[in-house]
């Protein structure tokens, strides 16, 4: 992603840091301005001067002359971010000190003994929010660090200087923002407190479990029968009446009773110690009692209990436990208790009717404007925040009561309704987010809201939240009744220190949000309102009522159709947007793509079909020279490919930058240096290459590939994102510390510890297909580097008997460990059919509490156990060539030569159920119309099925007769090699089913067979045969090429030996001759053998994955890949890209097809024969 766009997008997520980031865009424009010679206004020629008219030397000279101006601006930006960082760090330190003091106070006073206590919940939520603030500060630091580095890099390239490294080392890196470790310490201390809270939580849970045995007996007694229930209720009522007989009048008429209390009684109450009053815990108990009362089925009794709760519970408690200040503050104390209790109940699942009865019976003693002192630290929510954010109940009556019967003034209610909580949200935010239509409607018609579009800390307005959650009725009310802005303009931010507008506050565009969440109704409503507003403004013709565009680009430069195409939106939404004027061929501001590119890469065939109906163009190429069809083959699936093939592809391709060329040409023909101009950039003319060493004198691929001689290959693979780490769902405290990296360390001293940055990068290779020669230097400069790893960690060890691996998980920000686990040696000894297995390891925190699990895949490849062919004695597939070939070609590829040439006869090999390795025309045999897989049969069973002695081979063969023989007979591979002429070259096609084929076909594999053992036996036969040829006097090796559709088989073959090359073959994409459409198959073309064909439906939506195939071949040092000619024919650029990455490309041609004349392929696979060209260049 381009850094400028990335930085702009991040400002939406870090709204509180908006306008305080490095002004990267302004620095780029300054470089551009400083590079332009001073223009004379009187010269018409100068006014229309283009970049092509400016000599490059003049640009460099101008930048050197204005060097002081650029670095002056850069230093001001450094002062800005540094000053804001110091202020922000100071604020966070103060906030932590307050929270820490609260934590210590609560802990001493026993307020954290229960995880259900309000103090516990508030403290946990506050520390969780504080952790988020720390993470945001760290991201702010990293983004600015990257910004300064890239701005200096751009300066060096434009001015041809070398100031970047020196300035970063001597000026930027020594600033407090990049050197202080205060936030790291705060994060560690915060995590320590959260772990202690977690211990309290776990201890309480254990106590609850231990006490449950006692409560279960009571519950059984209370639920024996209906008669017993009735008797028990009567007995309980009688007992209550007896116990409270002397106090009924007092409870029902507490004001009168209080006035009649004698002075002796008051003196007795004054003697009670104030320290014994723990009002908070008692309020918690009252809270639970009211929730239990709400479950009573007798409605009249429930209502009576709620109405009398104040007298029967609260007032009695105050009489028995009040302090000396009771006589003076009894009413204020009672009011505080009832108000606090009511606020708790507002946020509870208590039904509205019960809560309303409780409120009406205590209305005179509940202050709706009350706000606890602790809440100013924790949440800053008032009663309207709590009512609006209650997810299960309406709570509308609270707003009605505040507006009608309460004693609150209108000004107070207005202040409460517009008050912001700790997340900068007003009650309208929560009501809109939860879809509380009546609550939103009541808020809007009060006319007390100062702003209907307030922006919270996540840059979201109530309208955006309603659209996100698909509350269309709320959206309609906000737009029509509240007058929410359907087309908001970024709000200016005033710099009070300078009394100027420093920047604008970035916010989400509602229509783009509706498109992102596939909200057709909201998009329709927004477009209708925007169109009407533009029509009214057009009639007005006033400068104050300018028409706003219907469609706006989001922070990453995507337009509405691009967003819909990327997420796979509803075709009706596409129709709606196009009906209102959206262009299906519009180019976005990020990748310079049209919407169909995004639909292809995201795999949305229905979107592609809809776009094609509206004349979306396919005869276009992006800046890298790739068409939508290329990306469909490169990283999409079969349905997408077939959707694109509905349109004829014989039209000449046009670059995307030629679309709407007239308007773009006009923009580029004049020099426009206004602050808002983003189209004109000197980067287009930049051709200065990155500093790079020349290619080595002897290319690495000249000497074949690495192989395992005695070491064991172990590869650990973490899953994309954070899928490998599963934290316990009910352990919210630990989950609040997001994993940021995993450290792997082994017990073996020779293995260096590794760090994996999280989240793990997905398998997509976004820029892998970019031409080396066409890579724009400016694009590299603008791209934000991804620090995340691909999750693969490789080790080579002598033995797995004593190999273990420790995994330590750390937060993304901080040094305190979150969790740890260990993989013991026995886990790596599990025999895997395809060499790949999965392990699940329990995760433990520092107190050895299990908090989740770590899931990862691992692959183990053992070295060849026998005597390999020594390279010094047996010529490998590569050979030394003259120095004239050891150069870099003009397209950036290393040119090497291979000894492979001529014709190679194809031999398919597989293992029987008894481990016998045979050569066969297909991986199955037909018996009375039934296809039986060879791996299901033993040698004896196979002979009975084929009805001949397959171990006996009569006569000798030449190339022609050998092909005919292999097309109809199943023979042991060892016997076959003995009778084949030594001059015959072979391509050994290794058949071994993949894990998915084993599961979906399904295929039964003998427990005595796995891919490691199978390849060991295969290599043993090949090596013995080669030695036999050498000792028989032939003096040379038989030329052999290994090929397989099983990716793991190719990898293992390449790691076990260096003598023979390995090709990875694709056979899972076929073209139906009747329909002309492509169909998916399994890697070994076994779909027709599936027991349940419905299980194979995934093949049409499974990724074609040519890009992953190419990347796998490169990572495992394979010689090349084999692709169907039908695929290469429809997209010739695939061949160029694959060959530019140093791989041989073999075109696989069907038996009924003609051999292509000259498609630039390294070889042709045709009719069970592999034909290599002479002098193959790689």
Swiss-Prot record:
Q: Protein name, please?
A: Phosphate system positive regulatory protein PHO81
Please name one Pfam family that this protein belongs to. C2_GDE1
Which gene is the coding source of this polypeptide chain? PHO81
Q: Please list the residue ranges annotated as the SPX domain.
A: 1-169
Q: Which domain of life is it from?
A: Eukaryota
Q: Is this entry keyworded Metal-binding? A: no
Function in brief: Inhibits the kinase activity of the cyclin-CDKs PHO80-PHO85 and PCL7-PHO85 under low-phosphate conditions.
Q: Where is the GP-PDE domain?
A: 871-1178
Q: Which organism is it from?
A: Saccharomyces cerevisiae (strain ATCC 204508 / S288c) (Baker's yeast)
